Amino acid sequence: MNNLKKNDKEVLEEFANLFPILLNEIKKELEKIDFPKESIHWIETVIKANSTGGKMNRGISVLESLESLNEGRALTRHEIFQAQTLGWCVEIFQACYLVSDDIMDQSLKRRGKPCWYKQKRPNSDQEVGLAAINDSFIIESCVFILLEKYFKNESYYLNIVELFHKTGFQTQLGQLLDLTTQPIRGDFSSINLKNHTRITEYKTAYYSFFFPVALAMLMSKINHEQAFTTAKDILLPMGVYFQVQDDFLDCYGSPEVFGKIGRDIEENKCSWMICQAILNGTPDQINLLKKHYGFDNPTDVEIVKKIYKEINLEKIFKDYENTSYNFLIDKIKTTCIYLPPSVFLKILSKIYKRDK
């Protein structure tokens, strides 16, 4: 039994130490089918490069949520291992979408390093390039190798496999919305908070917030529909709040701290920042934004950021952050009938006023 309460650093280290073991299991499965060594090395490199280096909040949330859901008793070593393994499945699952998202957005950096498609191929000076598309498929498939190996005999196996498929589909729908609601330059008719919220819920909130907690609930054999509804009602707004932070940091965050170079302005994104600028700007400012938003050159970007400063979007964001935090705290206190509030408070404490 695990009776000693670990601090955050110890939890992170223990979680990180499991990754090489799981990666080796994937390698062994590939060796069983006599796959070429060079190709196995490629797959190992792909998974390691894209699954590690982040904050690992989503993965660790599975274990932390399981602990909160089972307050009053210590988890067994087996339960801890299973939760950590599921957590890594979440992190690896996320990696496949980061790889494809960076290609579609033509991003340059991810977690402080060049995006995978911009990196050198294993044992080559050539860029990975569009081979990264297939790599994203492979990363996703490797998740199901791990799920089958470690959870096939669990009573909740089918439920977690279905949840992975459903979450993947929701994320893909979110990416579709993100790509197809990008307006024609100068046309702001589709840039509004309603569209922003819809994109965010599907692209970010489900897999980053609801997904890890729902996995812990399935491990705990919670099957009350209202419990899952409550979790969704709290975690989707939390995911929207998280994305708004991301949109703010995309513009104002330090690339060294944030881990990537923001490109929402250049890519004509339906970002919270431009939505607020349209709501709070003067007609002249909005006309200027229509002329300069969505163009990939420094002069246009600088003009957009200058207008953001004139509108004082930093203050608008800080007010939003405080309002959202209070809203979420109140929602947790008033709706947590079937689930302990600590499940959600722990997650909220990690993202409140974050800078990366």
Curated annotation (Swiss-Prot):
Mg(2+) 1 binds at residues 101, 105. Its cofactor is Mg(2+). Key enzyme in isoprenoid biosynthesis which catalyzes the formation of farnesyl diphosphate (FPP), a sterol precursor. Keywords: Cholesterol biosynthesis, Cholesterol metabolism, Cytoplasm, Isoprene biosynthesis, Lipid biosynthesis, Lipid metabolism, Magnesium, Metal-binding, Steroid biosynthesis, Steroid metabolism, Sterol biosynthesis, Sterol metabolism, Transferase. It is found in: Cytoplasm. GO terms for cellular component: cytoplasm. Inhibited by aminobisphosphonate drugs (aBP), such as risedronate and alendronate. It comes from Dictyostelium discoideum (Social amoeba). Binds 2 Mg(2+) ions per subunit. Mg(2+) 2 binds at residues 101, 105. Dimethylallyl diphosphate binds at residues 110, 203-204, 243, 260, 269. Belongs to the FPP/GGPP synthase family. It catalyses: isopentenyl diphosphate + dimethylallyl diphosphate = (2E)-geranyl diphosphate + diphosphate; isopentenyl diphosphate + (2E)-geranyl diphosphate = (2E,6E)-farnesyl diphosphate + diphosphate. GO terms for molecular function: (2E,6E)-farnesyl diphosphate synthase activity; dimethylallyltranstransferase activity; metal ion binding. Pathway: Isoprenoid biosynthesis; farnesyl diphosphate biosynthesis; farnesyl diphosphate from geranyl diphosphate and isopentenyl diphosphate: step 1/1; Isoprenoid biosynthesis; geranyl diphosphate biosynthesis; geranyl diphosphate from dimethylallyl diphosphate and isopentenyl diphosphate: step 1/1. PROSITE patterns: POLYPRENYL_SYNTHASE_1, POLYPRENYL_SYNTHASE_2. InterPro entries: FPS1-like (IPR039702), Isoprenoid_synthase_dom_sf (IPR008949), Polyprenyl_synt (IPR000092), Polyprenyl_synt_CS (IPR033749). Its EC number is 2.5.1.10, 2.5.1.1. Isopentenyl diphosphate binds at residues 55, 58, 94, 111. It is an enzyme of class 2 (transferase). This is Probable farnesyl diphosphate synthase DDB_G0278823. GO terms for biological process: cholesterol biosynthetic process; farnesyl diphosphate biosynthetic process; geranyl diphosphate biosynthetic process.
